[in-house]
C-alpha cells in the first residue's frame, strides 16, 4: 500500500471511529439531558457545570501533558535487536508508556484534594446544606482517582492508534453514566418526591440532582477502568504478557543505563505542562469568569448554552482535532518532504471544510436556533434569556472550531522552546481576555453576551498566533521548493470568496424577508436555502471531493 494512502487511511479511520463514538455517547447524553432539563432548574445546571469544571480541570492538569508528550516517545525499534509484538511496536516502548501512565495519578491525587477543598470552602452555604451534597463531592473526587488509574491503558491504545477500542469504551462509559444519572433523577421525582405544591420538595430535588450527577461521573470512571482492564487481561490470557501494568524499570539491550522514563519525553513534558495550563485557563476561563461575575442562574444558562450550542463542536470537530493531533505527531516524527506535503494538504483541506461549515452556522444558526430549541427546553427555561443568548453563541462556534485544528497542529509539531514561548503569549492573551470580560460584562453590562464576545476575541487572537506559526513552519521547511509547487497546494481562496459572497446574499435576503424563524413554514424555507447553498459548495469543490474519495477508495 502507498505510504501516503496508508497514513490517510489511518487518519480517516481514526476520525470515523472517534466521530462515531462521540455521536453515540453524546447522542445518548443529549437525549437524556433533554428529558432531564424539564425536571431541573437553571440553578442546578449552574452548580453541576461548576462541579464538571472542577473535575475536568483536575483531569486536564493531571494527564493532558502526558498524553501529548508520550506521542513523541522514541520507539526502541530504531536501534538494537527488537522484541516485537503483533502491532509492530516493541515491548520496551509499550512498557515506557505504562510507566508514564502513573504520573497523572501522582499529580492528580494531591491536586484534586487541594482544588476541591479550596473550592468547597468558597461555596455558597445554600449548596453545602443541600441533601447528599457532601457525598456528591466525595464521589466526584473518587471518580477522578479511578479515571486516572486507567490512564496507563489509555496511553498504550493512543500510541497504537487503537481508535476503535478507545471510542467504544468511552461511548460505554458516557452511556452508562447518563443512564445512571437519568434513572436516579426520574426515580426520585416519580417515586419519592411528592406531586403538587404541598408535597413537592424543590430543596430535596436539587440535592438528589447533584448526587445523581456525581454518581454518573463515578459510573463513567468505573466503566472505563473495567473495560480497559478486561482488554488488558484478556490479551495476557490469549497472547501472554507483552508488557506489565506495574511500574517496571526498562533495561535496553545497549549499554545504556536502565530507566523508568525516557529523558527526552520527560523534558518535553515539563515544557508542555505549563503551556497547557495556560491554554486550559483560557479555554475554560469563561467558567471562572461566570463563577465570579454571574449569578448561579446565569451559570446554569451558560452551561445549557455550552451543551446545546457546542453540540456540533463535540460531535464533529473534537474527533477531527484529536485524530489530527495523533496523525501529525506520528507522521512528522519522521523527517520527510513527502510527509510534510501530506500534512500540509490535510491541514488545508480541513481548514477549507471548517470555513464552509462556518458559513452555514453563521447564516442559519442565529435565526433558526431559538425556534428549534424552544421545543426541547421546558417551561423553567423559557422565561430565561437562554433563547436569545443562543443566537449570539452561534457566532462563537466557528472561532472555537478553527482554533481547535490550528492548536492541534501546534501541539503536534512545536518544539519545547516554541511551546515555552507560547506559554508567555498565552499569559498575555489571558490578561486581554480578563480585561475584555470586565469591559463587556461589568462596564457595558452585557452579561452572558459580553462573555461570548470576549471568548470570540480570545479565539481570534489564538487563531492568529497559531496561523502565523503554521505559515512560518512550512515556509521554513519547504523554502527550497519552487514557487509554482508551493502555490499549487495553497487553498483556492477565490472559490471560497465566491461562495461566501453568495452565502452572504442568501443570509441577507433570509433575514430581510423572514428574520427569526417562528413557524414550520419559515423553517422549511431555511432548510431549502441551506440545501441550495450546500449544492453550490459541492459543485465548486467537486474536484477536491473527487480527489479525496479516490484517495480513500485506493487506501481501502
Curated annotation (Swiss-Prot):
Residues annotated as transmembrane: 11-31, 41-61, 97-117, 136-156, 172-192, 207-227, 300-320, 353-373, 394-414, 424-444, 450-470, 499-519, 525-545
S-adenosyl-L-methionine listed as a keyword: no
Keywords: Endoplasmic reticulum, Membrane, Sugar transport, Transmembrane, Transmembrane helix, Transport
Cellular component terms (Gene Ontology): endoplasmic reticulum membrane
Membrane topology, as annotated: Multi-pass membrane protein
GO biological process: dolichol-linked oligosaccharide biosynthetic process; glycolipid translocation; protein N-linked glycosylation
Family of the protein in this entry: Belongs to the RFT1 family.
Function: Intramembrane glycolipid transporter that operates in the biosynthetic pathway of dolichol-linked oligosaccharides, the glycan precursors employed in protein asparagine (N)-glycosylation. The sequential addition of sugars to dolichol pyrophosphate produces dolichol-linked oligosaccharides containing fourteen sugars, including two GlcNAcs, nine mannoses and three glucoses. Once assembled, the oligosaccharide is transferred from the lipid to nascent proteins by oligosaccharyltransferases.
Protein name, UniProt field: Man(5)GlcNAc(2)-PP-dolichol translocation protein RFT1
Organism placement in taxonomy: Eukaryota, Fungi, Dikarya, Ascomycota, Saccharomycotina
